[in-house]
Amino acid sequence: MQLSPSEISGLIKQRIEKFDNSVELKSEGTIVSVADGIVTIYGLNDVAAGEMIKLPGDVYGLALNLNTDSVGAVVLGDYEHIKEGDKAYCIGRILEVPVGEALLGRVVDALGNPIDGKGEVATDLTSPIEKIAPGVIWRKSVDQALQTGIKSIDSMVPIGRGQRELIIGDRQIGKTAIAVDTIINQKGTGVKCIYVAIGQKASTIANIVRQLEEHGAMEHTIIVAATASDSAALQYIAPYAGCSMGEYFRDRGQDALIVYDDLTKQAWAYRQISLLLRRPPGREAYPGDVFYLHSRLLERAARVNEEYVEKFTNGEVKGKTGSLTALPIIETQAGDISAFVPTNVISITDGQIFLETDLFNSGLRPAINPGNSVSRVGGAAQTKIIKKLGGGIRLALAQYRELEAFSQFASDLDEATRAQLNRGQRVTELLKQKQFSTLSVALMALSLYAADNGYLDNLEVSEVIPFESALHALAETKYSDVIAEINETGKYDADIADKLKIIVEDCKANQAW
């Protein structure tokens, strides 16, 4: 087939018109070393701190060390196929994770990929894992209670929405149990929960998922899991990923609760990464910025005002405040709260719940030490009725602890001292609470009223818990209207006091326990 000169010139013209002469700029580097999940890349001149780097085999790295002629990055995934001489590329994006309502009820890894076998997460929304915390002018004071349903916490160490309350103690003494109970107690309150598991066994995480499902709490919970078998890089970024998922709710005028279980393991992972990146070690071999590691994370938990929510949602949500409450967990070694990481986190948070091994072993569970535990801002948020009735409990316990030590050396005690010791023993017994048995505000108030007004003083210590169970059962069946009223209003006045008195005296008269 012969083409005429005009046809040939037409084809050439078409080709010239279709020719794409645009230049795609791509920052390319060469991997000069790879070991222990760390890659060193030469030639990436335009990379930013915290930027994602594309590595061979659809794996990404996170740029952490920016040197004069090289970049040190941690690999977010499998690195065994990466070798010296491979190419690496900047992609111009900071690490992001999926966020949104679709994550509720799911178990995801530190990058937001589902690991629960329930298919893909149906959300297109993403958020950077690192964000600047809201400034002072966007914050609102903490004045709404976050009920844990645990008597000793809600009465003595109250937590408010938007607070950071540290749970600290040795291993295996119930730190996670307190956090899980708090998540379960948010059922029906509208508070969304995020549980971040860092460096835990996969079987432990599976057990927590099962417990939450059994108590109907997975519907309002996201679980972010960086297991013990995951790399140090994933354990390091998991808390930030979980925090971004919680901020989605906070910034839209909702309330969220996030549990970091536990930040000690995150600090260990960060120490490992820093040492592999040849950063100079400091105290306990931690890098110099380990305080900033936790402060920039925990400062993102806040209560934000109406203006912040309205500005963030472009006017779609008006007149609503949002909050993100953080419950970081720190594991101590032999009760040493003066170690580096515990003291750092104590200084960052708004209070701490201190658990003691001796109390746990003596049968007091939750094993909370009321002397060392404090809530710096929760008092303003505490429910009025619990605040009124719980004040006497803390005083009774403090006096009891003081007298208990003294009474070991004294043979004969006066009547007043003996009465204080008796009440202290019964209050201590009353504060025992099994896991998964959280209480409503009204039932908690009923127990505190009975203790505060001396109704437990003439009971044997062994009768306190059975009496409390009978009291709650009676209140829920015969006096359900009073319980509903207290749960709804949370107020305490002479009328409510009279109603509580009638319930307690009715129970004592029946002796149904």
Curated annotation (Swiss-Prot):
ATP binds at G169, D170, R171, Q172, I173, G174, K175, T176. GO terms for molecular function: ADP binding; ATP binding; proton-transporting ATP synthase activity, rotational mechanism. The record marks S373 as: Required for activity. It catalyses: ATP + H2O + 4 H(+)(in) = ADP + phosphate + 5 H(+)(out). One of its GO terms (cellular component) is proton-transporting ATP synthase complex. It is a peripheral membrane protein. InterPro entries: ATP_synth_asu-like_sf, ATP_synth_asu_C, ATP_synth_asu_C_sf, ATP_synth_F1_a_nt-bd_dom, ATP_synth_F1_asu, ATPase_a/bsu_AS, ATPase_F1/V1/A1_a/bsu_N, ATPase_F1/V1/A1_a/bsu_N_sf. Its EC number is 7.1.2.2. Its main location: membrane. It is found in: Cell inner membrane. Keywords: ATP synthesis, ATP-binding, Cell inner membrane, Cell membrane, CF(1), Hydrogen ion transport, Ion transport, Membrane, Nucleotide-binding, Translocase, Transport. SUPFAM superfamilies: C-terminal domain of alpha and beta subunits of F1 ATP synthase, N-terminal domain of alpha and beta subunits of F1 ATP synthase, P-loop containing nucleoside triphosphate hydrolases. Pfam families: ATP-synt_ab, ATP-synt_ab_C, ATP-synt_ab_N. Belongs to the ATPase alpha/beta chains family. PANTHER family: ATP SYNTHASE SUBUNIT ALPHA, MITOCHONDRIAL (PTHR48082:SF2). Produces ATP from ADP in the presence of a proton gradient across the membrane. The alpha chain is a regulatory subunit. NCBIfam families: atpA (TIGR00962), PRK13343.1 (NF009884). HAMAP family: ATP_synth_alpha_bact. F-type ATPases have 2 components, CF(1) - the catalytic core - and CF(0) - the membrane proton channel. CF(1) has five subunits: alpha(3), beta(3), gamma(1), delta(1), epsilon(1). CF(0) has three main subunits: a(1), b(2) and c(9-12). The alpha and beta chains form an alternating ring which encloses part of the gamma chain. CF(1) is attached to CF(0) by a central stalk formed by the gamma and epsilon chains, while a peripheral stalk is formed by the delta and b chains. This is ATP synthase subunit alpha. It comes from Francisella tularensis subsp. tularensis (strain WY96-3418). The gene is atpA.
